[in-house]
């Protein structure tokens, strides 16, 4: 058996040279200007394989749509966001008077801590009547840890925000489970699904989410198609117009699913 003396003299032979690994990117900050004139400032993680390092067009567009429809979508309502990243739609929902907002993303410590940081950044513009919570959540898991944030007597949400989540078509069944478990069975409850096909050749796969939703007790309505001024990634391949386009859908319980 080798002993410690056998390895004397190697020193730093197997030590990685300085600069061998690229330095970790520093966090950056971005701002979302609300229609009300208020500014939501968020920190973006320096880099992350789950894309928490960007403020996506779908997030901005969802936030603006929620603000425009605040009286019917969020005022006094309970809101859940999945795949929130920086959490702008959640924060805007709280600012516009939602009763409860639960902001979630994959239960990665960096993502969750960053969401908490962003919630605290906007605390001064959130009314005292609104409560904003942050949690890690893996799509398809039980929702009871999320509904635990709701006021006594409530066990589901009026609004489910799903911005740029349908890109992962393998996760479509789990996203359907989230809607089935978390969305209140009411004609007024709605899931807001907003996305941009950053890889346009995968758009048909993205869109398979909607017939799957219809097969599982929901009705789907396309509500907007907004072309942004410029693409998020200038050098990416694929149709440039599609990469600038944000698609918006509302998903509600089909009438035959309501009590």
Curated annotation (Swiss-Prot):
The keyword DNA-binding does not apply. It is found in: Cytoplasm. InterPro entries: EFM7, Methyltransf_16, SAM-dependent_MTases_sf. Gene3D superfamilies: Vaccinia Virus protein VP39 (3.40.50.150). The keyword Hydrolase does not apply. Its EC number is 2.1.1.-. GO terms for cellular component: cytoplasm. It comes from the Eukaryota. GO terms for molecular function: N-terminal protein N-methyltransferase activity; protein methyltransferase activity; protein-lysine N-methyltransferase activity. It holds the Pfam family Methyltransf_16. GO terms for biological process: methylation; rDNA heterochromatin formation. Keywords: Cytoplasm, Methyltransferase, S-adenosyl-L-methionine, Transferase. S-adenosyl-L-methionine-dependent protein methyltransferase that trimethylates the N-terminal glycine 'Gly-2' of elongation factor 1-alpha, before also catalyzing the mono- and dimethylation of 'Lys-3'. This is Protein N-terminal and lysine N-methyltransferase efm7. The gene is efm7.
């Amino acid at each position: 058996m080798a002993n410690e003396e056998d390895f004397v003299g190697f020193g730093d032979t197997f030590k990685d040279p300085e600069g061998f690994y690229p330095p970790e990117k520093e966090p950056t900050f971005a701002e979302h200007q609300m229609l009300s004139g208020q500014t939501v400032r968020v920190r973006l993680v320096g880099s992350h394989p789950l894309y928490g390092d960007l403020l996506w067009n779908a997030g901005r567009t969802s936030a603006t749509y929620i603000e425009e429809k605040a009286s019917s979508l969020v005022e006094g309502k309970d809101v859940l966001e999945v795949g929130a990243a920086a959490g702008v739609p959640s924060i805007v929902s709280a600012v516009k008077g939602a009763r409860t907002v639960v902001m979630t993303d994959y239960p990665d410590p960096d993502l969750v801590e960053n969401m908490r940081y962003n919630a605290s950044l906007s605390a001064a513009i959130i009314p005292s009547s609104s409560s904003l919570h942050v949690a890690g959540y893996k799509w398809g898991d039980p929702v009871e840890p999320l509904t635990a944030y709701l006021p006594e007597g409530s066990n589901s949400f009026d609004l489910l925000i799903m911005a740029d989540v349908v890109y992962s078509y393998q996760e479509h069944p789990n996203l359907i489970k989230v809607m089935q478990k978390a969305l209140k069975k009411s004609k007024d409850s709605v899931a807001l699904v907003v996305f941009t096909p950053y890889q346009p050749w995968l758009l048909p796969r993205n869109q398979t989410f909607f017939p799957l939703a219809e097969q599982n007790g929901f009705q789907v309505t396309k509500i907007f198609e907004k072309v942004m001024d410029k693409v998020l990634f200038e050098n990416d391949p694929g149709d440039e117009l599609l990469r600038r386009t944000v698609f918006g859908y509302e998903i509600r319980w089909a009438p035959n699913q309501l009590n």
